[in-house]
From Swiss-Prot:
UniProt KW Cell inner membrane keyword: no
Family (UniProt): Belongs to the SbcD family.
Record key words, sorted: DNA recombination, DNA replication, Endonuclease, Exonuclease, Hydrolase, Nuclease
Stored InterPro entries: Calcineurin-like_PHP_ApaH, DNA_Repair-Maintenance_Comp, Metallo-depent_PP-like, Mre11_N, SbcCD_nuclease, SbcD, SbcD_C
Naturally occurring in which organism (per UniProt): Staphylococcus aureus (strain MRSA252)
Subunit: Heterodimer of SbcC and SbcD.
NCBIfam families linked: sbcd, sbcd_Staph
Name of protein: Nuclease SbcCD subunit D
Length: 373
């Protein structure tokens, strides 16, 4: 049996004011073409299909087109669950009718102990839910963390587990120790959001969404597919794609399959003049770029100048102000006032004080000392 595991499409995502629908349409077209080659028995989408609970019409249309090609044209069964970014009611609309074409949409807990059986494999679904939603569903005020809530869910599923079959869990959550990125919205505020791996022991394999790094956690049976695209500059350099999971004679194996996007996220560090004069290495000028540059304090509108050469510049950081706080605190504590000012001026401008500037500052310091006396 072959299963394709994907998640975190985040359709409609806007990064630093840039709408990413073109990039998402490109990668979904590539994904569909790959599925023609893969010919999987089923595709699992583990949450966050949309980036917001109220996606745009274009984002909705893009999802409908992709699912239509996969499910109706290629006739591949699909299981999808809601993530913390998805609007449950919107994603679940028409779900009972879609099941006639083996498109299974799960957005709540009403069927957590009723697996979807495909080719003898039982797929249990555990869509994203807040702590308060789990507390309300189980009518249990003692549930105060995701760990407690998910544990209660697994306890509900456990009596239904067929130990003679392969049992797979699909969920959208954070496993303790998983690598996070800036584009993942926190699941909770003020409570512990991660879940310990041991809670999943009753399952043969676990397919997760939420964390965007495909290797967020090192485990033989608990896997994240990662997002289809890089969605924050903290993800720059990360491979993106999907997981191919195979089951042969009861043995489960998986491999990550990378996809090449239309554009990547790239971070460029260096001198402002070198970048403007194109003396730095950039993989692709059309990539989405975050520049971290020195010596640009004198430039009136550096972002506009950069965009004339690098049209998809999305972020600019003035590196002049970055420093090692601990080391500088120790160094400054051993300096006199004049030396500190000289160091600060050099740090900001990369120049030394002129004799005229030094004399003026010395006079000011001497006058202040006289006032204190």
């Amino acid at each position: 049996m072959k299963i394709i595991h994907t998640a975190d499409w985040h359709l409609g995502k806007i990064l630093n004011g840039k709408q990413l629908l073109e990039d998402q349409a490109y990668i979904l077209d590539m994904f569909v073409e790959k599925m023609k080659e893969e010919e999987p028995d089923i595709i699992v989408i583990a949450g966050d299909l949309y980036d917001t609970t109220y996606p745009s019409k274009d984002a909705i249309m893009l999802l409908e087109q992709a699912i239509g090609k996969l499910n109706l044209e290629l006739r591949i069964p699909i299981i999808m669950i809601s993530g913390n970014h998805d609007g449950k009611e919107r994603l679940n609309y028409g779900a009972s009718w879609f099941e006639n074409n083996q498109l299974f949409i799960r957005t709540d807990f009403t069927s957590i102990n009723s697996p979807i059986e495909i080719n003898g494999v039982n797929f249990y679904t555990l869509p994203y839910a807040t702590v308060s939603e789990m507390k309300h569903y189980f009518e249990d005020d003692t549930i105060e963390t995701h760990q407690q809530g998910i544990t209660r869910c697994i306890e509900t599923i456990a009596p239904e587990i067929d130990e003679g079959a392969i049992n797979i869990l699909i969920s959208h959550l954070t496993v303790q120790g998983g690598k996070t990125s800036d584009s993942e919205r926190p699941l909770t505020i003020g409570t512990v959001e991660s879940v310990q791996k041991g809670v999943f022991d009753i399952f043969d394999y676990v397919m997760l969404g939420h964390l965007h790094h495909p290797f967020s956690i090192e485990d033989d049976k608990i896997k994240y597919s990662g997002s289809l695209l890089q969605y924050s500059f903290s993800e720059a350099g990360q491979a993106k794609g999907y997981r191919r999971v195979t089951i042969n004679d009861g043995i489960i194996n998986d491999v990550f399959i990378p996809l090449k996007p239309l554009r990547q996220l790239e971070i460029i560090s260096g001198e402002y003049n070198d970048v403007i004069n194109e003396k730095v290495h950039v993989k692709n000028k059309d990539n989405y770029l975050h520049f971290k540059l020195k010596n640009m304090s004198h430039i009136t509108d550096p972002m506009m100048s950069l965009k004339q050469i690098y049209p998809n510049t999305l972020a600019l950081t003035n590196e002049t102000f970055s420093y090692n706080e601990e080391n500088n605190a120790i160094e400054i504590s051993e300096k006199d006032d004049m030396s500190i000012i000289e160091m600060f001026y050099n740090h900001i401008t990369d120049k030394e004080l002129s004799d005229i500037q030094s004399n003026k500052i010395k006079n000011i310091l001497e006058n202040e000392l006289r006032k204190e006396d």
